Amino acid sequence: IEKRVKETPNATWPVHAVVTNSTYDGLFYNTGFIKNTLDVKSIHFDSAWVPYTNFSPIYQGLAGMSGGRTEGKVIYETQSTHKLLAAFSQASMIHVKGEINEATFNEAFMMHTSTSPFYPIVASTETAAAMMRGNVGRRLIDESIDRAIRFRKEIKRLREESDSWFFD
């Protein structure tokens, strides 16, 4: 980035960065490191595939909203709630940590939203949030992780016992 800024006439240092976290195939970044070292005023973590990260300690430090505020920065995290939590298709959330100008934020938000919202989508985000509130949300995520681990172990066991082409 520094090289490109220097090579570009009239360019100034960026003030905003967008980081895809996690990637579609499950790659997470150390968001604490990014927040503390990336020299920009605001960072947007596009966390479309991982709206569940704040509900399990195994993801601590891997989500945009992990940890406290970052001095002098605004952190945004967007999540496609419909992908992995119980919300209707197209439902998503924007999380903000840090000091923002609410009028400017709301103006930008309203520019990209409908004047005729489909209220069942809005209600489904509220329902998804309520389902994940407190210990219930943590328990749901813990059970999902436990099932995924058991499934992987069972597939591994079946592969070790099989001569079938299915596992090749």
Language-model segment annotations:
Residues F166-D168:
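Low-complexity, serine/threonine/proline-enriched polar segments
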Residues I1-R159, D163:
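Conserved PLP-enzyme active-site core in the AAT-like
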